[in-house]
Protein backbone atom coordinates (compact mmCIF):
# COMPACT_ATOMS: atom_id res chain seq x y z
CA UNK A 1 0.00 0.00 0.00
CA UNK A 2 2.81 2.41 0.91
CA UNK A 3 4.48 1.62 -2.40
CA UNK A 4 1.33 2.57 -4.29
CA UNK A 5 1.05 5.85 -2.35
CA UNK A 6 4.66 6.79 -3.13
CA UNK A 7 4.08 5.97 -6.79
CA UNK A 8 1.03 8.25 -6.94
CA UNK A 9 2.56 11.10 -4.91
CA UNK A 10 4.43 12.81 -7.82
CA UNK A 11 1.25 12.86 -9.92
CA UNK A 12 -0.70 14.37 -7.01
CA UNK A 13 1.91 17.11 -6.49
CA UNK A 14 1.88 17.83 -10.22
CA UNK A 15 -1.91 18.15 -10.12
CA UNK A 16 -1.73 20.65 -7.25
CA UNK A 17 0.79 22.77 -9.16
CA UNK A 18 -1.37 22.74 -12.27
CA UNK A 19 -4.28 24.10 -10.24
CA UNK A 20 -2.42 27.22 -9.19
CA UNK A 21 -0.88 26.07 -5.90
CA UNK A 22 2.63 26.50 -7.26
CA UNK A 23 4.20 29.64 -5.80
CA UNK A 24 7.11 29.77 -8.24
CA UNK A 25 7.35 33.32 -9.61
CA UNK A 26 8.41 32.00 -13.00
CA UNK A 27 5.51 29.62 -13.38
CA UNK A 28 3.00 30.38 -16.09
CA UNK A 29 -0.05 32.16 -14.74
CA UNK A 30 -2.84 29.60 -14.83
CA UNK A 31 -6.55 30.22 -14.89
CA UNK A 32 -8.30 26.90 -15.18
CA UNK A 33 -7.13 25.11 -18.31
CA UNK A 34 -5.80 28.24 -20.00
CA UNK A 35 -2.22 29.28 -19.34
CA UNK A 36 -1.04 32.74 -20.23
CA UNK A 37 1.50 31.15 -22.57
CA UNK A 38 -1.40 29.92 -24.68
CA UNK A 39 -3.47 33.10 -24.26
CA UNK A 40 -3.06 34.16 -27.86
CA UNK A 41 -4.76 30.96 -28.98
CA UNK A 42 -7.89 31.39 -26.87
CA UNK A 43 -10.91 33.53 -27.59
CA UNK A 44 -12.29 36.28 -25.37
CA UNK A 45 -15.18 34.06 -24.34
CA UNK A 46 -12.82 31.21 -23.43
CA UNK A 47 -10.64 33.49 -21.34
CA UNK A 48 -13.62 35.07 -19.62
CA UNK A 49 -14.92 31.62 -18.72
CA UNK A 50 -11.57 30.56 -17.31
CA UNK A 51 -11.19 33.79 -15.33
CA UNK A 52 -14.59 33.19 -13.76
CA UNK A 53 -13.48 29.68 -12.83
CA UNK A 54 -10.23 30.88 -11.31
CA UNK A 55 -11.81 33.72 -9.29
CA UNK A 56 -8.40 35.36 -9.04
CA UNK A 57 -7.28 38.94 -9.57
CA UNK A 58 -5.04 38.98 -12.61
CA UNK A 59 -3.63 41.38 -15.15
CA UNK A 60 -3.93 40.52 -18.81
CA UNK A 61 -3.59 42.24 -22.16
CA UNK A 62 -6.66 42.09 -24.36
CA UNK A 63 -4.94 42.77 -27.67
CA UNK A 64 -2.53 40.27 -29.14
CA UNK A 65 -0.05 42.44 -31.04
CA UNK A 66 2.18 44.85 -29.22
CA UNK A 67 5.83 45.56 -29.97
CA UNK A 68 5.68 45.26 -33.74
CA UNK A 69 2.59 47.44 -34.12
CA UNK A 70 3.90 50.10 -31.77
CA UNK A 71 7.18 50.26 -33.65
CA UNK A 72 5.42 50.44 -37.01
CA UNK A 73 2.86 53.12 -36.23
CA UNK A 74 2.77 54.31 -32.62
CA UNK A 75 0.51 57.32 -33.21
CA UNK A 76 -2.52 55.79 -34.86
CA UNK A 77 -3.11 52.55 -33.02
CA UNK A 78 -6.01 52.10 -30.65
CA UNK A 79 -4.97 50.06 -27.66
CA UNK A 80 -7.40 48.49 -25.26
CA UNK A 81 -5.95 47.13 -22.06
CA UNK A 82 -8.04 45.70 -19.29
CA UNK A 83 -7.17 45.38 -15.63
CA UNK A 84 -9.32 42.68 -14.15
CA UNK A 85 -9.78 43.24 -10.43
CA UNK A 86 -12.22 40.40 -9.92
CA UNK A 87 -14.70 38.43 -11.98
CA UNK A 88 -17.45 41.06 -11.72
CA UNK A 89 -15.68 44.39 -12.30
CA UNK A 90 -12.87 45.64 -14.45
CA UNK A 91 -11.36 48.93 -15.54
CA UNK A 92 -10.83 49.39 -19.26
CA UNK A 93 -8.23 51.74 -20.69
CA UNK A 94 -8.67 52.87 -24.28
CA UNK A 95 -5.78 54.73 -25.92
CA UNK A 96 -6.56 56.46 -29.20
CA UNK A 97 -4.28 59.15 -30.54
CA UNK A 98 -3.88 61.91 -27.95
CA UNK A 99 -6.95 60.82 -25.99
CA UNK A 100 -7.12 58.33 -23.17
CA UNK A 101 -10.44 57.02 -21.94
CA UNK A 102 -11.38 54.92 -18.95
CA UNK A 103 -14.51 52.83 -18.62
CA UNK A 104 -15.71 50.74 -15.71
CA UNK A 105 -17.44 47.64 -16.99
CA UNK A 106 -19.16 44.67 -15.33
CA UNK A 107 -17.98 42.56 -18.26
CA UNK A 108 -14.73 43.35 -20.01
CA UNK A 109 -15.92 42.05 -23.37
CA UNK A 110 -18.81 44.55 -23.42
CA UNK A 111 -18.26 48.02 -24.82
CA UNK A 112 -18.39 50.73 -22.18
CA UNK A 113 -19.07 54.45 -22.26
CA UNK A 114 -15.78 56.38 -22.67
CA UNK A 115 -14.98 58.91 -19.95
CA UNK A 116 -12.27 61.50 -20.41
CA UNK A 117 -9.35 60.71 -18.13
CA UNK A 118 -8.93 64.34 -17.03
CA UNK A 119 -12.48 64.41 -15.64
CA UNK A 120 -11.86 61.55 -13.24
CA UNK A 121 -10.41 62.53 -9.88
CA UNK A 122 -11.44 59.70 -7.57
CA UNK A 123 -10.70 56.52 -9.52
CA UNK A 124 -7.98 54.62 -7.69
CA UNK A 125 -6.03 53.33 -10.64
CA UNK A 126 -2.49 53.11 -11.90
CA UNK A 127 -2.98 55.93 -14.38
CA UNK A 128 -4.33 58.27 -11.72
CA UNK A 129 -1.35 57.33 -9.54
CA UNK A 130 0.80 58.11 -12.55
CA UNK A 131 -0.57 61.66 -12.65
CA UNK A 132 -0.17 62.06 -8.89
CA UNK A 133 3.47 61.08 -9.22
CA UNK A 134 3.97 64.07 -11.56
CA UNK A 135 5.36 61.87 -14.30
CA UNK A 136 4.74 63.46 -17.67
CA UNK A 137 2.05 61.66 -19.63
CA UNK A 138 3.09 60.83 -23.21
CA UNK A 139 0.61 61.73 -25.95
CA UNK A 140 0.17 58.07 -26.82
CA UNK A 141 0.56 55.61 -24.00
CA UNK A 142 0.63 51.85 -24.19
CA UNK A 143 0.46 49.28 -21.43
CA UNK A 144 2.37 46.04 -21.38
CA UNK A 145 0.89 43.59 -18.93
CA UNK A 146 3.20 40.73 -18.07
CA UNK A 147 2.02 37.25 -17.15
CA UNK A 148 4.82 35.33 -15.54
CA UNK A 149 3.57 34.58 -12.05
CA UNK A 150 0.93 32.51 -10.33
CA UNK A 151 -2.64 33.77 -9.77
CA UNK A 152 -1.79 34.69 -6.19
CA UNK A 153 0.88 37.11 -7.41
CA UNK A 154 0.48 39.95 -9.91
CA UNK A 155 3.40 41.00 -12.05
CA UNK A 156 3.85 44.78 -12.38
CA UNK A 157 2.70 46.44 -15.58
CA UNK A 158 4.99 48.66 -17.57
CA UNK A 159 3.66 51.82 -19.22
CA UNK A 160 5.77 53.62 -21.78
CA UNK A 161 5.53 56.13 -24.57
CA UNK A 162 5.54 55.52 -28.31
CA UNK A 163 9.30 55.89 -28.58
CA UNK A 164 9.67 52.81 -26.34
CA UNK A 165 12.53 54.42 -24.43
CA UNK A 166 10.83 55.74 -21.29
CA UNK A 167 9.47 53.15 -18.90
CA UNK A 168 7.25 53.52 -15.86
CA UNK A 169 6.79 50.65 -13.45
CA UNK A 170 3.31 50.20 -12.00
CA UNK A 171 3.06 47.87 -9.04
CA UNK A 172 0.16 45.55 -9.76
CA UNK A 173 -0.75 45.11 -6.12
CA UNK A 174 -0.39 48.62 -4.71
CA UNK A 175 -0.70 50.80 -7.82
CA UNK A 176 2.49 52.63 -6.86
CA UNK A 177 4.27 54.23 -9.81
CA UNK A 178 7.99 54.71 -10.27
CA UNK A 179 9.97 55.73 -13.32
CA UNK A 180 12.65 53.43 -14.70
CA UNK A 181 15.67 55.41 -15.81
Regions found by a protein language model. Give the residues of each.
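Sec-dependent bacterial lipoprotein signal peptides
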Residues: 1-17
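Long, terminal "pre-/pro-" and other extracytoplasmic accessory regions
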Residues: 19-181
